[in-house]
């Protein structure tokens, strides 16, 4: 009303403008606080593999540690010499070949996922799996609950799909179930997006107790759970509290995505997407219409890594490398030790700087260093405390 009076225009015109800006991801309404310009309004916050200039020390992009490249080369050569090789080069089996899906089912058992080939598909990476799920299950204007700081590329996906993200507060155990329920009552959420094994960027893990509390709200309010579990292979067997993904508690309302870029190989674009019967038709239509079929060759290489036991060895080696990198970080920042995931591929560093995120990132780049500021990951009202990932 104040803006309408100031501009001398109709109140309903301003209301419509606010709504359009929210759909475009330019504004974020925070219940009880007001409407704020989104931190990502003036620029894309997408984090990609675009190479920085050679002299730049890249401490921002998440490095998944390339290991066992010689073994991958040999497996690829072996596959290329097989009689069935031509079958891996065509459009057949858009959800993955039967034996590839069976291997995926067994692989996911390592992290507490129980499914079968009829409820699993191979997709071309986690990001495409999430994009396909948003296209299939959500409509423009729908609201999705997310952590206050969440995966930057998901923020951009939501903007592309004209979806509104609603920030849900959290504590040391992860997103608070009571706040999720409250925001659903205020904003009529359709779904919730979570990374329970290791939230990107905060490194926070959702405890088993909190998973059960969140599952109760998701079940009771009939929300759709989108679970990105990219870090689960560094959580299972490492974190004592880990009993499996959140999706196992609400399987009929969940789309669960487990990518292989972090535990295995970033360049092989393969992720496993697990879904219930109720979402099958919509997800398959999205897969066929967008045509994001995973390369059968990539799927076969990942399958061979699993069947030969190389995949397990790769995970173990990466766990060792991640532990070594984290020890190095905590040597310089001992006050942060014990916070977040012990084997995270990134850390969340508080900084005493209240400048805007783009300005801080630019200041670091001028010193030859690339880092990512917390503004990239922010949904909702900006806090006084800022961070670097």
Q: What do these predicted regions represent?
A:
Residues 1-80, 89, 288-295, 317, ...:
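N-terminal basic, amphipathic alpha-helical segments
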Residues 28-29, 115, 371:
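Short beta-strand "wing" residues that participate in macromolecule-binding interfaces
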Residues 32, 116-117, 340-346:
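Short Gly/Ser/Thr- and Asp/Glu-enriched loop/turn motifs at secondary-structure junctions
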Residues 38, 276-277, 307, 350-352:
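Residue-level recognition of strand-loop junctions within catalytic nucleotide-signaling folds
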Residues 88-221, 226, 233-253:
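Conserved core of the PLP fold type I
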Residues 253-341:
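PLP-dependent aminotransferase class I/II
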Residues 275, 348-354, 371-389:
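Conserved PLP-binding active-site segment of the aspartate aminotransferase-like
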